[in-house]
Amino acid sequence: MLIVIDASRLERKRKEAIKSRTVHNRHHYFEGVAQARFVLRKVFRLIEEQAKLGGLDPLEHQVLIQIYGSPQMKLRVKEVAEKLDIAPAFASNMLKSLEEKGFVLRLASERDQRVNYAVVTVQGKQLLHRIDEQVQVHVDYFTRQLTQDAREAAISIVMFYFGISLNAGKVTHA
């Protein structure tokens, strides 16, 4: 289902959020923040539920996503830790668990045998695809329930956080 959003309305809401953040009564700003956090939290919870149904801890699911979604489709333990903002030792333990489940392989670097990379196995990719398909069903249902105002409020706050502005149909960094 494709939902079309009026870019000029969205940009107006983003500007209103910025302005309302600078006044004494910031209710309008926090209204947008609340909506954005509600939408993001709900979507993340839906993703976590599907990961659990797929037999993964939600953080293990994130590990697989980060590895598979990286440009080279491989990451070192240190990089996994950075991407998830966790300790390298914890990242190493999660990779070991995923390796035992058959979802990750650890391979030595061709250039430096001391460096190991984690790669997602075919089985791991298939699991990610299945989880994603189920997530999409649930997210589509959830987002269809949102009003246009709620959707625009959430998007405008995310745009504000990322410093993005809509200008004559083109996205620019504010």
Segments predicted by a language model, with ranges:
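C-terminal regulatory/oligomerization modules of transcriptional regulators
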Residues: 1-24, 148-174
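Short, hydrophobic-biased segments on the C-terminal half of alpha helices
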Residues: 77, 95-96
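Pre-recognition alpha-helix immediately N-terminal to the DNA-recognition helix
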Residues: 35, 42, 62-66, 126
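N-terminal helix-turn-helix DNA-binding core of bacterial DNA-binding proteins
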Residues: 45-87
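N-terminal leader segment of winged-helix/HTH proteins
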Residues: 1-54, 101-103
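Solvent-exposed, charged/polar functional surfaces in cytosolic regulatory/catalytic domains
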Residues: 42-50, 83, 126, 130, ...
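Charged, amphipathic alpha-helical coiled-coil/dimerization segments
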Residues: 11, 18-19, 96-155
